[in-house]
Amino acid sequence: MIGIVSAYNDVLSAHQPMANYPAIIKDEVRKPAAVAQFAGGVPAICDGVTQGQPGMELSLFSRDVIAMSTAIALTHDLYDGAMMLGVCDKIVPGLLMGGLAFGQLPTIFMPAGPMPSGLSNKEKANIRKQHAEGKVAPDKLLEAEMAAYHTEGTCTFYGSANSNQMLLEAMGLMIPGAAFVQPNDPRRMLLTRAASARVVALTTTPEGIGEWTNERLLVNAIVALLATSGSTNHTMRWVAIARAAGFEMTWQDIDALSRVTPLLTGLYPNGEADVNEFNRVGGTAFLLRELLDAGLMHDDVDTVMGRGLSLYTRALGEIGADTHKLTYVPEVKRSQDLTVLRPVAEPFSTEGGLRLLKGNQGQAILKISAVSPEHRVITAPAHVFDMQIEVITACKANRVVADSVVIVRNRGPCACGMPELHQLTPALSVLLDRGLKVALITDGRMSGASGRVPAAIHVTPEAAAGGALTRIHDGDIVTVDCDSGTLHLHVDAATHLARSNAPTPAAKSGWGRELFAVFHDNISVADCGASIFGN
């Protein structure tokens, strides 16, 4: 008996294609005389849709809700295996955390794939920036957004959703090549059928996802994240996943791996390519082979296909004309475009895309690969805000006219659910284009596609918990040094500690936010996974 847990809904383009997956799975598992049931659905929130809206304050919490919903779906104790259908930021980590609570079950993940490329990410970002300057009308902005996000499938930039798929394939928890096949590609249905057949076969083996997910598999996931400069969100997501699997992972671990992991991709926001181009020029098969050959990943792991991550170094081929079955080509040994994907011997950088910053303000995460070298070091006065909209208003009113370190505090997990502050990117990018040196420091999140502006995010301890951010004043001199990994407030320690903590804005209610008060009271800090489990 196979249990299906799905994040299907009609709101998210990434999840809409999954409407017919349960029927396909049920049909396929009947062939070996098995049965599949739809065990349960889980919610799926899109941070792109909820940017700047009340729902963004529920986004972080939704991951743990999804984990609990997954556990409820599987708790009937009927199942011998599980199929997880999900794609986006919180959804895959939540499904994985919930699945690990049933570690005895063989479990396979199946995504829907990216939408075909539309308006390029570079053009989209430029129009957003022009709109922030008042040069593009709202209707033109809407046209651009509709041209970029124009059909079913995952967003094509390399943000949290596509990072999820990269990491799951690097962990061997999906069928090889499944990460980036588009929804309407005929291979997508065959991949879903192959996963269905495979999970039935795995029910005859003694091990499940709990045994597979060991420290080597977790390291492989983080190396894949760093080699592709994936989503900053996953510095919290995979810490929480590691804990669900029984391991402790720290930001120091991630930073240490980043120092020795080369950056091999030029995907937006680190470059101009999207995931469709990445898949076309070599994709995960090339990337994983390069990292394995360089000794940067563990091959001695168990995957849903069997022993060894090297099983994932063959590329998905075209469908056989006569067989209508999936085919694989031998190991991909050359990238078809070095502006998109490079070998270990010719990396974009000798270090990975994410960096840990530390100092007397706490510690923070930064996506260094998206920041040009000339913008990586700044010492400037602080401009302190509590809300994203306050920053945008100040920029529009030309109140930020000199080099500045913008502080947005009281946006952490216990303060207000750690919302993404991606609307800051266009506004602060305008300041960069005016020749100013600008950096951002916040205890909130940015998008998985954060770029251009040096953004020290996920600051911990957060302001609401008495962290240093709560005692920073306008005009204090602050240094953000991305290269050395330094975050420094140039205020005497005694003076800083003698200051009163700034008031924490009261958590807002309405739009369902009042239902999540228990999360505010019990959530762990960002570097421990920002989770209510095991705090």
Where are these regions (language model features)?
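Catalytic or ion-coupling anion/metal-binding cores of large enzyme and transporter domains
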Residues: 1-10, 14, 23-42, 53-55, ...
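Glycine-rich beta-alpha loop segments
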Residues: 18
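N-terminal small/polar loop signature for handling phosphorylated ligands or for N-terminal nucleophile
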Residues: 39-77
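Contiguous domain-boundary segments centered on the initiation and propagation of an alpha-helix
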Residues: 63-71, 75-82, 392-400, 405-407
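A short, small-residue-rich loop immediately preceding and capping a beta-strand
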Residues: 74-95, 108-110
